[in-house]
């Protein structure tokens, strides 16, 4: 399948919209977790997204879906399974660790993509991208530490006893990090599939497969869900519409035109977006340490992605 004829700048302009969209996820999840188990939140998120796409997909892309080969379908099922594991792991991590720590750890995805893509996709990563990712990840670490550190006139004072972290916090951190590894695998499979199937059928099939896996997991672990307050269904619907359909669809679409590492490193903007949205909608003013971390993340993204295609002479295999 040939790439559509679009202006080369369009994918680079659309990706920031995806960052804003996915940044709403942690807030909506936190609201929902007061009433809904984490795996059920993940199941609702993927199931609602798939149902919303169903009518349009059947009307506009029914013929393409019927013509898909088993080779494409089996990778689509694998992508759906990985997406289900990613969301189940990450959303559950928010029960045990802070939003900042969870989001920062799950956005280490670019590191895993950078490590794995040369072997599984044959892509070469520009040296400047590694430098940018390092700076951005440093900013992410600072944002995570801002939850346990205080900015004082004489410097930064961290009160946490890192030698005695509770098992729940460690579990949350591990689940978020595991979600990042799984997300990297999902992105690489998506890169492979996006050259063989158009966007809407791809995301519909992946979301549907993911929803089936998550619903099965929910029924096994939690049973049939009860009725929730009306506001909870609004949060779950927004979770499906904004970060899932809009945000992740943008990233899936961009994989057809942009290097996998570029798409993955832009996901590092999510902690920044989450902090900004919390400031406006939750009246949470970020401390100076968190602002410094946000600036580093933005700087790293800019450095790692600026004129990436002109860096071919500095590629690392």
Predicted feature locations:
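C-terminal-most transmembrane helix of multi-pass membrane proteins
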Residues: 2-4, 46, 128, 145-146, ...
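Specific alpha-helical transmembrane segments that line the substrate/conduction pathway
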Residues: 40-51, 91-124, 129, 140, ...
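Glycine-/small-residue-enriched transmembrane alpha-helix faces in small-molecule transporters
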Residues: 1-43, 81, 85, 89, ...
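Cytoplasmic-side transmembrane-helix entry/capping segments in multi-pass membrane proteins
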Residues: 16, 71-76, 125-138, 197-206
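Small-residue-rich packing faces within the transmembrane alpha-helices of Major Facilitator Superfamily
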Residues: 23, 47-51, 137, 208-212, ...
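Hydrophobic transmembrane alpha-helices of multi-pass small-molecule transport proteins
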Residues: 53, 77, 116, 125-161, ...
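Hydrophobic/aromatic residues within transmembrane alpha-helices
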Residues: 32, 41, 45, 93, ...
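Hydrophobic alpha-helical transmembrane segments of multi-pass membrane transport proteins
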Residues: 16-24, 28, 56, 77-96, ...
């Amino acid at each position: 399948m040939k790439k559509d004829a679009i202006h080369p700048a369009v994918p680079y302009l659309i990706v920031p919209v995806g960052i804003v969209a996915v940044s709403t996820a942690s807030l909506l999840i936190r609201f929902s977790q007061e009433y809904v188990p984490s795996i059920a939140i993940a199941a609702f998120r993927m199931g609602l997204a798939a149902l919303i796409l169903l009518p349009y997909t059947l009307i506009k892309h029914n013929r393409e879906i019927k013509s898909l080969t088993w080779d494409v379908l089996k990778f689509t099922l694998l992508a759906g399974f990985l997406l289900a594991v990613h969301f189940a792991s990450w959303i559950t991590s928010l029960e045990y660790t802070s939003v900042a720590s969870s989001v920062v750890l799950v956005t280490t995805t670019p590191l895993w993509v950078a490590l794995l893509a040369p072997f599984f996709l044959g892509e070469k990563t520009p040296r400047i991208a590694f430098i940018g990712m390092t700076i951005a990840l440093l900013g992410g670490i600072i944002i995570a530490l801002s939850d346990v550190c205080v900015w004082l006139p004489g410097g930064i004072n961290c009160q946490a006893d890192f030698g005695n972290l509770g098992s729940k916090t460690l579990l949350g951190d591990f689940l978020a990090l595991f979600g990042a590894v799984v997300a990297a695998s999902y992105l690489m499979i998506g890169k492979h599939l996006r050259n063989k199937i158009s966007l809407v059928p791809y995301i519909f099939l992946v979301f549907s497969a993911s929803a089936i896996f998550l619903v099965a997991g929910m029924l096994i672990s939690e049973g049939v869900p009860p009725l929730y307050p009306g506001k909870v269904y609004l949060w779950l619907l927004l979770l499906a519409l904004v970060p899932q359909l809009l945000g992740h669809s943008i990233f899936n679409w961009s994989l057809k035109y942009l290097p996998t590492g570029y798409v993955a490193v832009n996901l590092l903007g999510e902690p920044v977006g989450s902090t900004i949205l919390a400031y406006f909608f939750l009246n949470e003013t970020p401390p100076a340490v968190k602002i410094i971390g946000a600036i580093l993340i933005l700087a790293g993204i800019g450095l790692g992605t600026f004129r990436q295609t002109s860096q071919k002479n500095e590629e690392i295999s």
